[in-house]
Amino acid sequence: RNFANDATFDIKKCDVHRLEEGPPTTAVLTREEGLKYYKIMQTVRRMELKADQLYKQKIIRGFCHLYDGQEACCMGLEAGINPTDHVITAYRAHGFTYTRGLPVREILAELTGRRGGCAKGKGGSMHMYAKNFYGGNGIVGAQVPLGVGIALACKYNEKDEICLTLYGDGAANQGQIFEAYNMAALWKLPCIFICENNRYGMGTSVERAAASTDYYKRGDFIPGIMVDGMDVLCVREATKFAAAYCRSGKGPMLMELQTYRYHGHSMSDPGVSYRTREEIQEVRSKSDPIMLLKDRMVNNNLASIEELKEIDVEVRKEIEDAAQFATADPEPPLEELGYHIYSRDPPFEVRGANQWIKYKSVS
């Protein structure tokens, strides 16, 4: 069967703040890109559903915040930047850890606290890191000043790199975010502030938490755009637009991605006490990011349903194998508790004794 090489799609116009014009309202998707995006988004979705299952079996313990429903955000952002650019986010970090290049098995093994995990089983759900990905961060909003620091480093070192600094609609009300806006604007830092607005901060809807829910205007003197966070192409085009702005030396930009999480805030939240099952169902049936991409591809002869089903089978197998690894891999031994605290073995002595000898550095 002859497939089309690419297709052009109309995408939702972004609302803008302090800008003459926003990102384009059309996007070209090649067949190759479409298949890649589909596979990555489907992998994130299945990985999160597997994490849900392992949590309910008490194999994953502690904090666990799932990303299903928001796959268009991590995929679209990654598609709009370079691998050498930087990303930092809050604790809903599994999707970004994957799009930044880590294999599923290392992510699931981190969730189960095993040696093969990306942080050697010591970080868990909220503390995963990859190349140029500065992780999940457990404190609400605390990653935003860090992201501005990364952008400062990019500028200071005269690198043509930018930092995507993510936070949620709940964290948007944190004072430190406004302090970070000010510094980024003052020093014209290459930072894109990205508010993933999934409508609820824990159990509080945006209307109950914010006097103004136009998060993209919150930067006041920083230009902002409001983006459909359920459409991977919309997110990609907006990211390219914001990245070009930041790279040109004009300073920061704010992006609000309007998205939705299918799970509760964390695994301890069933997610239905402050919103109705019907609301979740409606989003799933009308604006699911994976369904939207799939329909576009099938209806525009970029892929066949059979081909996408084959990808689904591949993804499921990859997730099953990863889960197998994450449950069979050994836990780190107790004596490694103090390892990896210092990047190099500390040489200094206190009162003639080296207290740190037991905290070896690299494994």
Curated annotation (Swiss-Prot):
Kindly state which reaction or reactions the protein catalyses: N(6)-[(R)-lipoyl]-L-lysyl-[protein] + pyruvate + H(+) = N(6)-[(R)-S(8)-acetyldihydrolipoyl]-L-lysyl-[protein] + CO2
The answer to keyword Repeat applying to this record is no
PTM sites of type N6-succinyllysine: 36, 217, 250, 286, 358
Where in or outside the cell is it found?
Mitochondrion matrix
Q: What is its EC number?
A: 1.2.4.1
Q: Which Gene Ontology terms describe the biological processes this protein takes part in?
A: glucose metabolic process; pyruvate decarboxylation to acetyl-CoA; tricarboxylic acid cycle
Keywords on this record? Acetylation, Carbohydrate metabolism, Glucose metabolism, Magnesium, Metal-binding, Mitochondrion, Oxidoreductase, Phosphoprotein, Pyruvate, Thiamine pyrophosphate, Transit peptide, Tricarboxylic acid cycle
**Means of activity regulation:** Pyruvate dehydrogenase activity is inhibited by phosphorylation of PDHA1; it is reactivated by dephosphorylation.
Record function comment: The pyruvate dehydrogenase complex catalyzes the overall conversion of pyruvate to acetyl-CoA and CO(2), and thereby links the glycolytic pathway to the tricarboxylic cycle.
Protein name from the UniProt record: Pyruvate dehydrogenase E1 component subunit alpha, mitochondrial
Originating species: Sminthopsis macroura
